[in-house]
Each structure stands twice: as C-alpha cells, then as structure tokens.
Amino acid sequence: NMMYQTAGTQINLDYLSENDFVKKFKLVASLTPLSIGIFANSPVKEKKLTRYLSYRSKVWQSTSRGGLPKIFLENLDFEKYADFILTKPLLFVNKGNKVIAGKGKTFQDFMMGNIKEIKNRKPKKKDLEVHLSTIFTELRLKKYIEIRSLDACEWDCHCAGPAFFTGLVYSSLEESLDIIKKWKTNDILNAYIEAPKKGLKTEINNKSIGYWGKVFLKLSKKGLISRNKINNKKMNETIFLKSVENILKENKTKAELIIERMKN
C-alpha cells in the first residue's frame, strides 16, 4: 500500500561534472533531515493520526531498499555510486514477458551472467535503468541528482522545495558546504531517523532544524536573487519560498497544522 498511500515532491538537479556532482550530492544528502523536517506534511494514515509528522518518510525509511546510506554523506563519486548499485540485490529481472524475482542476486551477478533463471544472459541498458528505478534511497544519481525526501503539499508550496534547493545548489553551493562540513555523519544520520517524528525540533550539531532551516533559507534566497530569473511581474524566484518562510517563522510544520485541525 505504501506506493498508493504516500506522495512526495521529487526534485531533479543538474550537475556539470563529476566534481560538481560530488559536491552537490553531498550537500543534498546532508540536508535530508531538513527536507523531511521542514516539509513534513503526512501525519495521517487512513483518516487517523499517526505518531509522526512525516509518516511517508517513516514508511520509506523502513524499506530495505530505501534510506540514507552512510556512504551518501561522504565524498561519493561516480565509481563509488556504481559499486553501491552493483552490490544492491535485484528486486526482479525481466524474462521475456515474465517478471522473475531477484532471489538475492545482485546486479553484479547479472553482469557476470550468473542468474540461471534467465539462462545466464547479461544485462542490457534497459535492465540497468529498471534496477536504478528500484533503488528507493532518499536521493539518487541518474543523468541528474534526484531528491526524494520531501512530502507533497498543496499548490501554494508546491514550488517551495525546488526553489529552496535551486537557490542552494546552483548559486550558494560553496557557502552551504562550508556550513555542513562541521556536521558529524552520525549526527546527520540520527537526525534523519528522528525528523519524521520531531520535525523542526530535530537537532543537528546541537541546533534545531528550525534554526538550520533559517540559515539555509537565507542562503537560498541569496542564490535565487543572484540567478535573477524574473517573471512578467518583475518578481524573482524568491516568491516561491513564501511557504518555507512561514513554516520557519511560525516554527510549525504543515503536519502540525493538520494535527491541530483534526484535534479541534
């Protein structure tokens, strides 16, 4: 049911080179707890309140093919990501019009021709694309960086997540990286686990996500202003950050507003 009962906002970001990818991927991975905490908007399951502000995040954290691998918080390059993908078990493989269970075999086994159920055939590009689509981590490498850690929300905030990360990744990258270099990997991973329940109160490096959200919101605004993308009303992209501004100003997530309405 989790694919039918959860909805997220996915964001795709470009990179220019492997070095550019390494920096952007590390930043986005490190900010995953903020993505969950700030954009928490799924406290309900089947018309009943759960114990979480982002129940969607909790559900996907619990899958064997999801989560935030520790290696994502290191200087992950293309080769290391390829190794990560190769050693992940196959969810399934296609045999003509049939779908065959992976049975613990990895994509590396597939490449070596060691899957007898498909007559030891080796993979094609399409097989790799299918395998990549069945890795449910909080972010993924494709021809772009795919962010998957935000809850979906209504129209007024739908562009907030993309705008938030656009401002950081494209125009305030080095300043953002300078901040997270002081964060310990285990602190980020702990915050990642706690964020679905604690939201803005989750702590990284002894400060709340609410605090860090304001720090990165300021950098995101700066980045969007420097991009200078103007609409026909002569307004720049910072207009899309209004929802995030309100959440951080009130120190209250959309999930908490839902909970208040349901309890009253």
Named regions from a protein language model:
Residues 29, 42, 46, 165, ...:
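Residue-level signal for alpha-helical context at structural boundaries
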Residues 1-140:
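Loop-rich catalytic cores of soluble enzymes, especially ATP-dependent carboxylate-amine ligases
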Residues 23, 30, 37, 83-87, ...:
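Charged/polar, solvent-exposed surface patches and flexible loops
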